[in-house]
């Protein structure tokens, strides 16, 4: 799934008028793009205005994601050095690791145990993000409940593959 803002959609029309020079696939932390290597030199070799890219990227991603979350970005550059970028949905495993960073670091044996309510709440947050990623104008009432339920079940399956399990209650 890709997301392109209205500003980037307008730039896309301009960029696509000329032949495309390069399409770059990058992984950048949300709101943390800067001139430091490897990103700065990588953009510099194509001659684009990197300061403009960093400002655009940081302002758009700060609104949508937590700072530092690894995002996949596709950057299109044409022969006139004009550019636009598309954001791709972060991997679910990356989102889960971001939510449970402290627990993953403290885990023994690689298995992470989370309370049932917290795990379901976080899975619903990720599912809502997935359902609304392409359609930023969608609100909670517009999300179809059956797709949300299916998405939550998929995320719970991803939790299992990432070794994130439900903590058993002590009274059971």
Swiss-Prot record:
GO molecular function: large ribosomal subunit rRNA binding; structural constituent of ribosome
SMART domains listed in its UniProt record: RL11
Compartments, record wording: Mitochondrion
Main location: mitochondrion
Family annotation (InterPro entries): Ribosomal_uL11 (IPR000911), Ribosomal_uL11_N (IPR020784), Ribosomal_uL11_N_sf (IPR036796)
GO annotations of cellular component type: mitochondrial large ribosomal subunit
Family the UniProt entry places it in: Belongs to the universal ribosomal protein uL11 family.
Name of the protein in its database record: Large ribosomal subunit protein uL11m
Source species: Dictyostelium discoideum
Higher taxonomy: Eukaryota, Amoebozoa, Evosea, Eumycetozoa, Dictyostelia
Protein's gene: mrpl11
């Amino acid at each position: 799934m890709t997301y392109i803002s209205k500003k980037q959609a307008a730039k896309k029309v301009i960029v696509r008028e000329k032949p495309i020079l390069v399409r770059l696939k990058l992984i950048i932390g949300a709101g943390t793009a800067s001139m430091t290597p490897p990103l700065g030199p990588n953009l510099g070799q194509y001659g684009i205005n990197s300061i403009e890219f960093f400002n655009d990227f940081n302002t758009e991603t700060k609104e949508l994601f937590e700072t530092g979350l690894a995002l996949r970005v596709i950057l299109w550059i044409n022969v006139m050095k004009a550019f636009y970028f598309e954001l791709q949905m972060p991997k679910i495993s990356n989102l889960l690791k971001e939510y449970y960073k402290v627990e993953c670091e403290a885990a023994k044996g690689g298995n992470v145990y989370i309370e049932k309510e917290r795990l379901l709440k976080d899975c619903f947050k990720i599912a809502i993000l997935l359902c609304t990623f392409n359609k930023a104008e969608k609100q909670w009432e517009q999300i179809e409940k059956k797709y949300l339920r299916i998405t939550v079940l998929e995320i719970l399956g991803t939790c299992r593959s990432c070794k994130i399990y439900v903590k058993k209650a002590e009274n059971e």
